[in-house]
């Protein structure tokens, strides 16, 4: 049951990414605040129904990020919702919860269900401009599994990982101790650059938004990543500010005044 809840959580955290990716700009370049629950694009300001590129929104969140900005150490759902816009895994869920290849271009699973092979997508960039390598992927998976560390997995689901091998510069083989039909969903876990020593201070991923700044108890700011690999699904927004508003009454007031868009 615990593993099933984990899988559902991995699929649900994509919801905010969908909202940010499909927001419609209003007249002032900000998102329309009249609909705070749906990612469906409004056609009122744009008769063709096509999303408008650019602009910014401010999203109200009930509390500051209380755990790590390191995606392998964060546990709170609110943190994951934000980090899911910064980081990507070998696969990622779409708006319907289907797992699609992301940093990986394709994948296959052995007949015994114990070996997962991924072909990496060519030219995927981290936010610092470096290119994702097989070594980065190997490092990320081994880090989650506690391999080459103190043996303690950073991500519990990866305790089943036996080893990770690189047959060639664009291929990764992940060997499991036991077959696990839910393991593919765990591979939404963030691929991070091996050369970044402190992801808490420098959150570097491959997602459609890159981290800009954080003011504790005030806000977290993300901006569009112009070199995002998925050219057909670029972020529409240029900037997203997550503003901490703990009082639910204040949220309503700010939405009405336009201080918050969502």
Stretches found by the model and what they are:
Residues 19-22:
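C-terminal motif of bacterial Sec signal peptides marking the signal peptidase cleavage site
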Residues 24-26:
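Bacterial signal peptide processing site
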Residues 53-63, 115-118, 137-140, 172-174, ...:
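Short, well-ordered beta-strand elements
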Residues 60-109, 142, 204:
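N-terminal lobe/hinge region of extracytoplasmic solute-binding protein
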Residues 95, 182-241, 247-250:
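Gly/Pro-rich hinge or "lid" segments in bacterial periplasmic/extracellular proteins
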Residues 105-150, 256:
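Aromatic- and charge-enriched surface segment that lines or borders ligand/interaction sites
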Residues 137, 170-172, 251, 256-262:
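Alpha-to-beta junction loops
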Residues 153-195:
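Surface-exposed binding/hinge segments that line
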């Amino acid at each position: 049951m615990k593993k099933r809840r984990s899988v559902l959580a991995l699929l649900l955290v994509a919801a905010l990414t969908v909202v940010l990716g499909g927001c419609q700009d209003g007249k002032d370049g900000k998102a329309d605040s009249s609909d705070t629950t749906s990612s469906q694009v409004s056609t009122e300001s744009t008769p063709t129904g096509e999303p408008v590129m650019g602009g910014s929104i401010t999203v109200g969140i009930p509390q500051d990020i209380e755990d790590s900005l390191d995606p392998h150490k964060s546990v709170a759902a609110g943190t994951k919702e934000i980090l899911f816009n910064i980081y990507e895994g070998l696969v990622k869920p779409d708006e319907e919860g289907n797992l699609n290849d992301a940093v990986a271009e394709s994948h296959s699973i052995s007949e015994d269900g114990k070996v997962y092979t991924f072909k990496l997508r060519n030219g995927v960039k981290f936010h610092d401009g470096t290119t994702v390598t097989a070594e980065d992927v190997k490092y990320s998976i081994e880090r989650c599994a506690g391999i080459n560390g103190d043996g303690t997995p950073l991500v519990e689901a990866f305790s089943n990982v036996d080893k990770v091998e690189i047959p060639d510069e664009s291929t990764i083989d992940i060997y499991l101790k036991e077959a696990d039909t839910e393991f593919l969903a765990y591979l939404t876990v963030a691929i991070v650059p091996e050369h970044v020593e402190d992801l808490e201070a420098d959150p570097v991923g491959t997602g459609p938004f890159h981290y800009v700044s954080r003011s504790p108890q005030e806000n977290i700011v993300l901006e569009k990543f112009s070199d995002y690999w998925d050219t057909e699904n670029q972020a529409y927004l240029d900037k997203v500010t997550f503003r901490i508003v703990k009082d639910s009454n204040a949220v309503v007031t700010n939405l009405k005044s336009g201080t918050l868009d969502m």
